[in-house]
Amino acid sequence: VDRTGELVSRYTGAEDSYVTSCASAGIAIAVAAAITRGDQARVTLMPDSAGMANEVVMLRGHNVDYGAPITSAIRLGGGRVVEVGSSNLAARWQLESAITDSTAALLYVKSHHCVQKGMLSIADFVQVAQVHNLPLIVDAAAEEDLHAWVASGADMVVYSGAKAFNAPTSGFITGKKQWIAACKAQHHGIARAMKIGKENMVGLVYALENYHQGQTVVTAEALRPVAQAISEIRGLDADIEQDEAGRAIWRIRIRVNAQELGMDAYAVEAQLREGDIAIYARRYNLHQGVFSLDPRT
């Protein structure tokens, strides 16, 4: 595990890294690290953090569900969520006023699931965390930039291996040595149930090497001929869309004209998924007659 962390850190530029089973596990472990600060007596008590500084301050617009509520991962690590601001707007003074003696960490979520306007910046979070001598955790699960979040000054940055990097099921926490050491201490507590297998460690490092060399990047230009071919089918109109959070991830967006095609978007998506070669689409906008194809998956 230590050696894998060293290899991962070569790609992130961080002082150290800790590998785990997935990004959700990484959030729980990072929260537990912030609360226990690596103290073994406290580690064995997690997720029971009664009597400890256990509050995790985050923006209300960042309180998302990625298949499970992010609050579930926070609670698994012993954290108690403190929301800041309203769903669509937050101010720095609100973040600062939420910090008390019970605060364990700040959490910043970078995700297409989050509200994208009216939120505080990562710079605001870094500055407030440093003033109050608190660790800053960044959930960058699906982010493709391995360097920016570490370079921002965050203490623990959580990534998924399987999302942007096309690794086997895996995740990792990368950041400052003090806090990664506290994450590693959780192996004798909650992280024991979240450990990663040796095969997936190898797969993660291999995937990061490929990603570093640019072998997994699919450009908008490469997708355009595919979109054009799809648009030639009567009742389908395809174009290229960029990821909602502004990442350099491009997908084919397909609009279904149910009257012309003879079936609606739900039926098209089901046929793709249930075919001899299963094709899984992004289904978030099926109710609008739209779905997307992500070439990475």
Q: What is each residue range found by the language model?
A:
Residues 231-297:
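Conserved C-terminal alpha-helix-loop-beta "cap" of PLP-dependent enzymes
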Residues 4-6, 158-160, 269-270:
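Intrinsically disordered, low-complexity segments enriched in polar/charged residues with Gly/Pro
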Residues 1-7, 101, 246, 282-283:
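N-terminal glycine-rich anion-binding loops that anchor highly charged ligand groups
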Residues 4, 217-230:
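N-terminal, charge-rich interaction modules
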Residues 209-214, 294-296:
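Glycine-rich phosphate/diphosphate-binding loops and the adjacent beta-loop-alpha structural elements
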